[in-house]
From Swiss-Prot:
This is Probable L-asparaginase 1. The active site is at T49 (o-isoaspartyl threonine intermediate). Glycans are attached at N27, N35, N40, N82, N106, N144, N179, N246, N302, N351. Belongs to the asparaginase 1 family. The lineage of its organism: Eukaryota, Fungi, Dikarya, Ascomycota, Taphrinomycotina. Its main location: secreted.
Amino acid sequence: MWRSIISFLFFSVALCQPFLFQKRSSNISDFISFNASLPNVTIFAMGGTIAGYASSSTETVDYAAGSVGIATLVDAVPAIKNFSNIRGVQVTNVGSEELTPANVLNLTQLILAEVAKPDVHGIVVTHGTDSLEETAMFLDMTVNTTKPIVVVGAMRPSTAISADGPMNLLNAVVVAASNRSIGRGTMILLNDRIGSAFYTTKTNGNMLDTFKSYEAGFLGMILDQRPHFFYSPATPTGKVHFDVSNTTELPAVEILYGYQGLNPNLAKAAVDLGAKGLVLAGMGAASWTDPGNEVIDGLISNQSIPVVYSHRTMDGFSDYYYNGIPSYFQNPQKARYMLMLSINAGYSIQNITDIFSLEY
């Protein structure tokens, strides 16, 4: 009983620490360990299943996401210290469905400050998988650096038998610490596979191998704690950089879902509620109904609302549709952030169309 109480108190105190690594050196800021021969990697923790806690080791569904602090996660993987010096920053600790553009903007600005430090080799972000690809895409478009940025999550909570989080975290640090990872943009890493933030997406709500990059393919894989890349360093075709270093708020952009008999007035309602742009998750390769297109045309012509036509299918290509902006290869959730950043930069509808078309 007393052991349980002590464990609970330790766990509760750990969650309250804003910066969980406090071991310091006179020369090194706040790395948990320091070996001059190893690269420095900073881990920004956002929460999610990788930081999830359940009352049973067999429970993989009914658990509390974002319950374990970054110090506890790192302590579970002592081998990390063999590959890099680690500094941990607990940014937030929630399920990723609760994250907002404000949270992602804050994370981005923290990372911008970190990669500007000459002694920092790479960045790891621990994150819930539900919206992981959105944050990764945002970072890929806003952090202009050749330093490795790796976004990692897990499909089983930290308390589960055979939890995938510890190995995923170790692999993410290995990739962030490797010179082979330089110049590849933001990467997503789970289940031993390394993917581009631009083209990797979550495809299954439950399975460990949920993250896929169907058409573009993976960048590489982890073999025996070594990153093996299939190609020389490169970034996605048409990748655009947006400066958000002084941005305090992003414009609202809503996603509307296409289906038989959709209410065409939902688009107008979204704009009336404050949306500055829309992304349509259209049927097939971005099809939208005729009544719906009439409303969209009015919003574009009369109110200069930029509207991106994307696809609700798992993968594919959305070419030019009506008077809107085709998303080409981008799915709705990633196209939303690209549109938000474009509007924030003050680009016209034609400018935004050109930005989306660069990858084609």
